[in-house]
Amino acid sequence: GVGAKSDQVIVYQPSAFAGTAAAISKAPLQVLKDQLLVRSLSAYGAVLPKEIDDTVFAFYGTTLSGTPQQEERWKRGVTFTTGALADDISKIYVQRHFPPETKAAADELVKNVVEAMGRRIDQLTWMQPQTKARAKAKLANFTTKIGYPDQWRDYSGLDIRAGDALGNAMRSSEFEHLYQYGKLGGPIRKWEWFMTPMTINAYANFNMSEIVFPAAILQPPFFDPNADPAINYGGIGAVIGHEISHHFDDQGAKYDENGRLADWWTPEDLKAFEAAGKALVEQYNQYEIFPGAHVQGALTLGENIGDLAGLTIAYDAWKHSLGGQE
């Protein structure tokens, strides 16, 4: 449908589709109609009459999430607008808060932390040369996205009308769906980001072999080009190291330098890596969040590796930047 030219798609969770199909086949027609109605009302509740909006929030906001009351109207308006026009609003944010000199400083710091990871790999005593070579190849093949995308989305085809909040919401939803469907059968849009420049976060994308740092996280207190380097390496440097390390954690380590699931470890090295991971799991299992509740180390392993390795290589990068000085 929708003009798709490809008859092949990658389904990450086949069981979800099978389960959904089974549930739909068993459900009475009226139940399916009711489900679609409820989903539509919840999706557009914010721009429907107040009674519907309040009912939707009472369930999704208060009952399910524990939020006692809605945000102020203007904040909700900002959230709605930035969701519909993310790139256009992001361009304004970048112009105001991320000047070229800040991007240049961030580019340099990311490069330094990536290089520190390479030196760390070289120093590993438990990893054999062939595995080190593959790990270094993976590191060298990273794409680093810093601040904002090289290409912005075009919203000229989106029809926005004053005084028509519901219509704008529905047209925006349709516009987004058609944009996503338009990717079918086409080349991979490597320039595309999966997080807006206004987001205070960062991410590692295993399939694309990339690390991404939006402009909003490259701000104080994480990053300030005028601050002492130690502050920046301890702040954003640890975040950069964290995302780099995700590509080599218990999940990221399953992907090769091309972003493909592949077994690139020697059996001996993989065994040593898994043993180290098990030790970290056991360490975190001992941490008590509050009386009687312990961290489940197996569930947090990837983040724990990211935190531990990330801070370590950020420190290494800072020490290296001193050029031997103390």
Question: Which ranges hold each PLM region?
Answer:
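Noncatalytic, helix-rich "gating/capping" subdomain that lines the substrate-entry/channel surface
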Residues: G1-E108, N112
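Amphipathic alpha-helical core segments of compact helical bundles
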Residues: T82, A86, S90, G241, ...
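Zinc-dependent metallohydrolase catalytic domains
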Residues: D107-G237, I244-E326
